[in-house]
């Protein structure tokens, strides 16, 4: 959704529903150099933060505040001083604390790590040995904030992060009702931009790192680095990337935009809104998802039937699907349809939405093709065991972009985003008039499901924040 632009008026901040916390998080300005373009773009985003009513209780900046990347310590200090004393002078950092993470533009060698410690001398020195002032944690009542260093030179530099200390902090602070972890690099690829160490945390760290978040009951990992806004969920924990604070590039261009994010935590969960540099609310999320019980979902008949949701693309709808059945025997890797959405009047057109299994491993696959004669995009999930029963739930969340195609194995299991290399999701999909269960749009012989006892049910919900 996008709100009307009012460049002079106040912007309503999301507030906790009862006791809680409200805050701003953003990253990647690459400024600190007076008179250069990023000073102007960063000022535009800060202008939006300054219009929030009320102002945030604290601000999380997720790295790449300055251009940095210089061998001259004096020049690096000067960039930091300009960023703090000029570009962020509007923020009363006594009333509204500012906490920062390390990043590739700011802590790229031993010298720059020392400058970071010097500039942010007031940050807690409670990190792991050797990382004091680079990794740290803060407790605000029932809220735990942990800041990890994804640039730790002692492990190898960019894309390397320590995990044992993180696990220990989460364990010792386990009484915190709300837990957020902040770092610069994502763990999971974003918008198809992928590369170990340079674009996301290295593979030897990524698994233990995410295990620590899941085991520690963390609500979200907030990161930046990839110049985009993106949200995914993996085993019930959100990865939220916000890297639009001023850097003039986009990943990809034409899709992403300058922005900040403002959020609220309370007893019901996390809500946030993503606001562009003109003050429009462009995207939003409330987590955990609120949805009707599975027992109340509507049965979808086998074969072709009218679709329960028809119309133009929208970003405020959630489609819930449940697939039960027995997987086909092993051996044949051709595609099998669970559900296809299509318009019979669109002669010769491929189904804009297809859900099924592909390959000899019978991997859950969702195909979304909103534009005729353009290659569709693919999302992949778990494999089905040949000949065995399965019960899968899928969410198509039009407010979550590419991370909004989710799956889980049961009502008690955590949600995870399907894997994709797309920069968009079902928000681009015009919803066709008909659904078919057990075969694709051209009839019973078109990519049929070869297993047995297929039962499909569905429900609709709306994005609410």
Regions found by a protein language model. Give the residues of each.
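A short C-terminal boundary segment appended to hydrolase-like catalytic domains
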Residues: 6, 261-314, 404-405, 419
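Glycan-recognition/cleft segments
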Residues: 340-367
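Extended active-site neighborhood of metal-dependent phosphoesterases/phosphodiesterases
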Residues: 2-11, 36, 70-178, 195-220, ...
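Short, aromatic/His-centered strand-loop micro-motif at the edge of beta-sheets
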Residues: 368-391
């Amino acid at each position: 959704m996008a709100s009307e632009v009012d460049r002079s008026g106040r912007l309503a901040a999301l507030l906790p529903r009862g006791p809680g916390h409200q805050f701003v998080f953003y990253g990647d300005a690459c400024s600190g150099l007076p008179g250069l373009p990023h000073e102007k773009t960063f000022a535009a985003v800060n202008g939006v933060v300054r219009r929030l009513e009320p102002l945030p209780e604290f601000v999380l900046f997720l790295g790449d505040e300055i251009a940095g990347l210089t061998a001259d310590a004096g020049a690096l200090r000067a960039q930091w001083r300009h960023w703090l004393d000029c570009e962020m002078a509007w923020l009363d950092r006594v009333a509204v604390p500012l906490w920062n993470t390390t990043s590739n533009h700011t802590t790229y060698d031993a010298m720059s790590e020392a400058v970071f410690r010097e500039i942010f001398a007031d940050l807690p020195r409670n990190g792991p040995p050797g990382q004091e002032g680079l990794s740290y944690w803060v407790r605000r009542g029932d809220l735990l904030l942990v800041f990890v260093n994804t640039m730790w030179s002692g492990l190898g530099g960019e894309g390397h992060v320590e995990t044992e200390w993180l696990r220990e902090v989460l364990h010792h602070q386990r009484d915190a009702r709300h837990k957020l972890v902040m770092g610069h690099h994502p763990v999971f690829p974003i918008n198809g931009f992928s590369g170990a160490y340079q674009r996301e945390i290295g593979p030897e760290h990524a698994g233990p790192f995410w295990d620590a978040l899941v085991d520690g009951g963390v609500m979200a990992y907030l990161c930046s680095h990839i110049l985009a806004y993106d949200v995914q969920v993996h085993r019930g924990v959100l990865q939220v990337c916000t890297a639009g604070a001023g850097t003039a590039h986009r990943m990809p261009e034409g899709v992403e935009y300058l922005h900040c994010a403002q959020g609220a935590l309370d007893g019901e969960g996390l809500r946030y809104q993503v606001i562009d540099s003109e003050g429009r609310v462009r995207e939003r999320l409330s987590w955990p998802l609120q949805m009707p019980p599975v027992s109340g979902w509507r049965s979808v008949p086998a074969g072709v039937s009218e679709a329960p949701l028809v119309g133009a693309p929208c970003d405020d709808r959630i489609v819930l699907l449940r697939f039960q059945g027995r997987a086909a025997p092993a051996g044949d890797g051709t595609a099998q349809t669970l559900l296809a959405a299509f318009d019979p009047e669109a002669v010769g057109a491929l189904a804009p939405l297809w859900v099924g299994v592909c390959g000899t491993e019978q991997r859950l696959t969702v195909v979304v093709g909103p534009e005729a004669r353009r290659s569709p995009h693919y999302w992949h999930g778990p494999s089905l065991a040949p000949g065995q029963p399965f019960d899968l739930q899928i969410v198509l969340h039009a407010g979550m972009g590419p991370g909004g195609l989710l799956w889980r194995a049961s009502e008690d299991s955590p949600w995870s985003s399907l894997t994709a290399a797309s920069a968009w999701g079902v928000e681009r999909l015009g919803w066709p008039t008909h659904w078919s269960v057990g075969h694709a749009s051209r009839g019973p012989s078109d990519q049929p499901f070869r297993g047995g006892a297929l039962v499909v049910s569905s429900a609709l919900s709306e994005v609410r924040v």
